[in-house]
Curated annotation (Swiss-Prot):
The gene is amzA. This is Archaemetzincin. The active site is at E138 (proton acceptor). InterPro entries: MetalloPept_cat_dom_sf (IPR024079), Pept_M54_archaemetzincn (IPR012962), Pept_M54_archaemetzncn_arc/bac (IPR012091). Binds 2 Zn(2+) ions per subunit. One is catalytic, whereas the other seems to have a structural role. Gene3D superfamilies: Collagenase (Catalytic Domain). One of its GO terms (molecular function) is metallopeptidase activity. It comes from the Archaea. Its cofactor is Zn(2+). The keyword Protease applies. GO terms for biological process: proteolysis.
């Protein structure tokens, strides 16, 4: 898991969020024999070409190849980048995250997960909950899961922050069975 804290705002550091995610994911994935490590900062300077000045956003797909190299460098099963910038993909105004199951990498943006983004007071607990949901969602894709029609399942597509707030941080029974099956395979 890679973090980025170079986005300057009055939102404060995301280190507590990264620590929370590392601890939670470490506990969740330990039962599948997967170790979760926080390996340091991801400099946005590597992604200057991904920035669209007209949109004031980064094209999310440009993070994935770099994460793939990091995954190889650490001989990891998967790599997750967490950034504090607004990201998008063509056809979408914004996205919370993007995964590439073939590369076994994903990126999640905290930018629109902050309650302050929506004019609400700061709430670190809510931010951590939202971040966990989006990270679990993208890692689900990394490990072979598609979107789920169950609005409470973490694999349900979030078209807005309301969708993220409605769903659970956990996989529904069907998605959890698929995840466990996929993680048991040696090639995943």
């Amino acid at each position: 898991m890679m973090g980025n804290d170079s986005y300057s705002s009055n939102r404060g550091s995301s280190r507590d969020v990264l620590s929370f995610l590392q601890n939670f994911l470490g506990g969740f994935y330990a039962k599948y024999g997967i170790e979760v490590k926080l390996v340091g900062g991801l400099s946005l300077s590597k992604f200057y070409y991904a920035f669209d000045a007209e949109r004031n956003q980064f094209l999310a797909r440009h993070f994935l190849p770099v994460l793939s190299y990091i995954k190889k460098d650490f001989n990891a099963r998967a790599a997750l980048g967490i950034v504090n910038v607004d990201i998008y993909e063509p056809g979408f105004n914004f996205i919370f995250g993007l995964a590439h199951p073939g590369l076994k990498v994903a990126v999640v943006s905290l930018y629109r997960l902050y309650p302050e983004f929506y004019g609400n007071p700061p709430d670190r607990k809510l931010l951590k909950e939202r971040a966990l949901k989006e990270v679990m969602h993208e890692l689900g894709h990394v490990f072979g899961l598609g979107h789920c029609p169950n609005p409470k399942c973490v694999m349900h597509f979030s078209n807005s922050i309301i969708d993220t707030d409605i769903k659970s941080w956990m996989y529904c029974e069907s998605c959890l069975r698929k995840l466990e099956k996929n993680l048991a395979r040696s090639h995943v």
